Amino acid sequence: MWVRTTITVKRWTEERSGRKIERTERTDITRLPSWKRGYPASVDSSSDLFSFSEGENKETDRRCWKHQHCPGHTIHPFSDCGHHNRCMHAVSQCDCESRCRSHRPVSVAIIYHPTHHMYMTDDDLEENWVSRKNHLSPSARPPDPNTGSATEVPDLSVPITIWRSESPIEKCQESNVIKDIKRKEKEQDEEEMVDEKANLKKKAKGKLTKKKTPVKSESSPADLSQSVRGPVRTPESSPESPGGLESEYSCERGKERPSSEDVVESLSPRKKEKTSSGQAKKNGTKKETQKTSKRKKSSPVPNPNLS
């Protein structure tokens, strides 16, 4: 609720000097609701905030400080706000505000007070007025048939606010800050996950490349089996064909040599032709020597008797 006070310098000085006006206006409390709780509007203010002067105006005495309070005009204490002994009245559904609009107030206090009214009995009023340190528990506001207008919807022209213990703007700002922090944390987590995945992929690629690197060419198992079978065949071959044995050994030696693709590709076609022609010549000469040896053995021996 917006709380408003209008005090003139003349009124404030009179209350500070003599309490005559205070006694006359204490009778106005009878026009308050039947429970008779709250502070009167004529209580003087101990604060020096209202001691400044903005010019004297004689018509200010006809404002709400002089009119008789209507049943809907309630007066509330605001001791919890730290504004002690300050005469304030809550603007509600009464015509006092319309009477004051034509006059400029000396000061206007707009105060955010706690979320509950602090009502006191008339007996405790004087004691608590002196000592503000006593804890005051909020009491429920009893209904009154005379103040039916107080519970109705107030006039739009009257300044009224909702009582809040915390500012909604600060809550919105805090929620926005929390959302920003959470969003940044999520982004950082996502970036870390992406980095971890990239590192794992790099490691897997490195392992694959290591496996694909060529190893030095060794004799294949087929070549080894052939080399083992080679000496086993040697006794089967006849002693009469040494050329055949030499050709078999030469073939086996050629097979036992490491055969790599790079060596085969490096050989030129001319070298291949020369090697093939050389091998053919060797085979031909060996065959001719074998034929001549057979002819010598098969030649008939001359019979001496026939001669």
From Swiss-Prot:
Region feature (Disordered): 134-155, 183-307
Superkingdom classification of source: Eukaryota
Biased composition (Polar residues): 216-228
Comp. bias intervals (Basic residues): 200-214
Gene3D superfamilies xref list: Phospholipase A2 domain (1.20.90.10)
Bias (Basic and acidic residues): 250-260
Modified residues (Phosphoserine): S220, S250, S259, S260, S298, S307
Keywords, in A-Z order: Phosphoprotein
Family that this chain belongs to: Belongs to the PROCA1 family.
UniProt-recorded name of the protein: Protein PROCA1
Lineage: Eukaryota, Metazoa, Chordata, Craniata, Vertebrata
